[in-house]
Amino acid sequence: MTKKNLAVCSFCGRSEKDVEKLIAGPSVYICDYCIKLCSGILDKTPAPATQEIATSSTSSPTSLRVLTPKEIKRHIDSYVIGQERAKKTISVAVYNHYKRIRALMQDKQVGYGKSNVLLLGPTGSGKTLIAKTLAKILDVPFTIADATTLTEAGYVGEDVENIVLRLLQAADYDVARAERGIIYIDEIDKIGRTTANVSITRDVSGEGVQQALLKIIEGTVANIPPKGGRKHPNQEYIRVNTENILFIVGGAFVNLDKIIAKRLGRTTIGFSEETDLAVTNRDHLLAKVETEDLIAFGMIPEFIGRFNCIVNCEELTLDELVEILTEPANAIVKQYTELFEEENVKLIFEKEALYAIAQKAKQAKTGARALGMILENLLRDLMFEIPSDPTVEAIRIEEDTITQNKPPVIIQKSPEAIA
């Protein structure tokens, strides 16, 4: 290696051959000599008050306030409509999980493990929103990962350790905070092994990924590369203990109801998938899910065994979709109403129009996710025109606006008001 190719300390300029250890950071290096020098300076300098507060928030046993299950559910209710059974189950699981962490921080003996959660349910039923809301009310770092992008080590794709890296980034590289965070892994059903995956080729995105995830979910000290592992193989690793990280995984698990029905000796109802009766029957079956059903679906026993809380999110009803439009603290209709109020224009939705929007979302088969797209398409042209038109006083959205694509009703200001 030539002199110009040697990495050097960004502070003192010593090359890697002149020091015992050279630690790499994002685009910088620091040697062991400079670390010792900085450490000596810090030992002689009183820490600022803000640093003392931060330290106390991560290490003090009393700093972790555990909300009761009722308090947790009440907060979730402010943002998540429906899913009463799921919200109660998760509230209890999260309460027990953080109560366990607090006990461990106080050096108490704990005889129960952590409460990882597996959420079943169709797209747009609120699985991700529940996880996001939990992280918000508990004030802990949170990250979302997509299971379909994960692969085993050695294959093209994302290493499972990168999930922990994203949580560490969400915690601003505060390891103690990250170790109490929440990781939500979506589309977990997509990594179920299938009978088609015979031994001719390696099951890159199925059983192998479950095995890789198993280690960090059950709890291990993971070596996390701060820049990601594959493009920067020589960087210094950060050690993160995943034992107290809460893992929530979710997936639609399409046709799992048929596996459950077979176990129960039932036949699935012979109606169209869109009928309310078929949906009710499917939700009823998923509520009876057992570990053996998930194994038959393609999840490995060791993986499923790490989730002692398995709960079903039911498909949202028409009334619940209407509530989602108007009731939560961050309801989408409230958001658009505020946008138009900033232009001094009143936005009015007739009740029939709200139900028409909900029906359209239901037909799209993406649950609550379709609501935002429908409203955006409906109001985009108005949001373009209104800022340039001071004559508009109000806009009324009627049922025909949704069902027959008729223009919204524009109510003009009186001439006196314009003047």
Swiss-Prot record:
Quaternary assembly: Component of the ClpX-ClpP complex. Forms a hexameric ring that, in the presence of ATP, binds to fourteen ClpP subunits assembled into a disk-like structure with a central cavity, resembling the structure of eukaryotic proteasomes.
Annotated family: Belongs to the ClpX chaperone family.
MF terms in GO: ATP binding; ATP hydrolysis activity; ATP-dependent protein folding chaperone; protein dimerization activity; unfolded protein binding; zinc ion binding
Annotated keywords: ATP-binding, Chaperone, Metal-binding, Nucleotide-binding, Zinc
NCBIfam families named in the record: clpX (TIGR00382), PRK05342.1 (NF003745)
Domain spans labelled ClpX-type ZB: 1-50
Binding residue positions for ATP: P122, T123, G124, S125, G126, K127, T128, L129
Highest taxon of the lineage: Bacteria
PANTHER family, sorted: ATP-DEPENDENT CLP PROTEASE ATP-BINDING SUBUNIT CLPX-LIKE, MITOCHONDRIAL, ATP-DEPENDENT CLP PROTEASE ATP-BINDING SUBUNIT CLPX-LIKE, MITOCHONDRIAL-RELATED
UniProt xrefs under InterPro entries: AAA+_ATPase, ATP-dep_Clp_protease_ClpX, ATPase_AAA_core, Clp_ATPase_C, Clp_protease_ATP-bd_su_ClpX, ClpX_bact, P-loop_NTPase, Znf_CppX_C4
Phylogenetic placement of the source organism: Bacteria, Pseudomonadati, Chlamydiota, Chlamydiia, Chlamydiales
Record keyword Cytoplasm present: no
Binding site for Zn(2+): C9, C12, C31, C34
SMART domains on file: AAA, ClpB_D2-small, zf-C4_ClpX
Protein name from the UniProt record: ATP-dependent Clp protease ATP-binding subunit ClpX
GO biological process, alphabetically ordered: cell division; proteolysis involved in protein catabolic process
One annotated Gene Ontology cellular component of this protein: HslUV protease complex
Protein role: ATP-dependent specificity component of the Clp protease. It directs the protease to specific substrates. Can perform chaperone functions in the absence of ClpP.
